[in-house]
Amino acid sequence: DGDMSGEGKGMWFGPRL
């Protein structure tokens, strides 16, 4: 869970997705 994780946060979808 973080800004640069992208766990469905909706603000940044990086390597997590």
Swiss-Prot record:
Its main location: secreted. The modification Leucine amide is found at L17. Coiled coil: none annotated. GO terms for molecular function: neuropeptide hormone activity. GO terms for biological process: neuropeptide signaling pathway. Expressed in abdominal perisympathetic organs and abdominal ganglia. Keywords: Amidation, Neuropeptide, Secreted. This is Pyrokinin-5. The lineage of its organism: Eukaryota, Metazoa, Ecdysozoa, Arthropoda, Hexapoda.
